[in-house]
Amino acid sequence: MSVKIRLKRMGAKKRPYYRIVVMNSTSPRDGRAIEELGYYHLIEKQNQLKIKEDRMKDWISKGAILSDTVKMLLKKNNLNAKSQEV
């Protein structure tokens, strides 16, 4: 089973927000998550990103793969994902 850290879309039509979750790589986008690590509010005046960094480091050390979008969000918000990879 391959595990990924990726975004899960939530919210109403045309008002999305995203949860950063750990999921099986074959699960659908809005499927059941193993664990929720944080959220990303796109519509807010200031894009809000909140992540449980200790849990993310733990999942990366267990072999979880970051999606391209999550990597981009971490880089954009000065949270270096490469330093967390083992």
Swiss-Prot record:
One of its GO terms (biological process) is translation. Gene3D superfamilies: 3.30.1320.10. GO terms for cellular component: cytoplasm; small ribosomal subunit. Keywords: Ribonucleoprotein, Ribosomal protein. Transmembrane segments: none annotated. InterPro entries: Ribosomal_bS16 (IPR000307), Ribosomal_bS16_CS (IPR020592), Ribosomal_bS16_dom_sf (IPR023803). GO terms for molecular function: structural constituent of ribosome. The keyword Cell membrane does not apply. Belongs to the bacterial ribosomal protein bS16 family. This is Small ribosomal subunit protein bS16. The lineage of its organism: Bacteria, Pseudomonadati, Spirochaetota, Spirochaetia, Spirochaetales.
